[in-house]
Amino acid sequence: MKLPIYLDYSATTPVDPRVAEKMMQFLTLDGTFGNPASRSHRFGWQAEEAVDIARNQIAELVGADPREIVFTSGATESDNLAIKGAANFYQKKGKHIITSKTEHKAVLDTCRQLEREGFEVTYLAPQRNGIIDLNELEAAMRDDTILVSIMHVNNEIGVVQDIATIGEMCRARGIIYHVDATQSVGKLPIDLSQLKVDLMSFSGHKIYGPKGIGALYVRRKPRIRIEAQMHGGGHERGMRSGTLPVHQIVGMGEAYRIAKEEMETEMARLRGLRNRLWNGIKDIEEVYLNGDLEQGAPNILNVSFNYVEGESLIMALKDLAVSSGSACTSASLEPSYVLRALGMNDELAHSSIRFSLGRFTTEEEIDYTIDLVRKSIGRLRDLSPLWEMYKQGVDLNSIEWAHH
């Protein structure tokens, strides 16, 4: 077993060796390096064929028509293209958008930008377990609501939203439904031929493909229109211009092909490892599970350890690559906005750790993790005056701290 142990698969994944090998065939002179938009020679045709195969591999994993897959530079761009693209195209119908407070920043910041441009956005607060109350969602829907954006799996706590029911609710009212599926694709079954979802964002690098490539699903029947955000050349049926990066697209396609083959066995294995980890630490005093094990992705475990300072905990766990919050916000010392939206106090939110497991995680690594976490929590609490006061029965919420 090698240290440090990587348990931050929700931030990014290593590229699968099978994917890397495939990508190498599309870079150099003796490979398929052509521009897929070059229609006048073989180099271009071969590149175009490689892109078509990858588009099919992605469509097959999610039950879509390959013509509904638009390549982008990643899920952040897909979220921007979906939300801005749909809002701008349908703004004559209305200017109201609904999302949730626990979405990824790529959705929240895009909505904030649209607010600056005159749109109105309702941000729903989830229930304590992170799940959106569908009655609240229904109550928020208005005649001028044009778009709902609610993710499939939350990147910090792993809870799974009921996108099938939300899709039905939106379709019944003629509202466009966008889903950020970055954390769920290849981990949970997605069948867009059955789901009433109009727009869905995907990434390559969360599922053992390369960074810098993603896709947006844009439904054809009923046809959804979006306004392009990137112009020049009219690639991707006019929705996203720019030369297609064949090696990255092929890598993403191969990663999705592998995911389709291995998803069922892999997810059962990861669920077992995640449960093993939780069962190994849940009897520590003042430990709280964030999210919902039953309605949660199989690979994410988010836990708060009360009376332990989050940053010092991460330092104590230096043999583990884990995070508190998402990678996009982990540089700030602000507590996770997702946990605060669940109604958690700052102290508890600060002491939260996200363990996210993946393809190369082993049982041995999980057992080492359990042991290290138990020792570290014990040691840090021995040093903590707050823990001592708590053990003596002092109600810490009733204390007024003096500001110097």
UniProtKB/Swiss-Prot annotation:
Keyword annotations: 2Fe-2S, Cytoplasm, Iron, Iron-sulfur, Metal-binding, Pyridoxal phosphate, Transferase
Superkingdom classification of source: Bacteria
Tagged with keyword Cytoplasm: yes
Primary site of residence: cytoplasm
PROSITE patterns (UniProt xref): AA_TRANSFER_CLASS_5 (PS00595)
Binding-site residues for pyridoxal 5'-phosphate, renumbered to this chain: 75-76, 155, 183, 203-205, 243
Protein's name according to its UniProt entry: Cysteine desulfurase IscS
Species the sequence originates in: Salmonella typhimurium (strain LT2 / SGSC1412 / ATCC 700720)
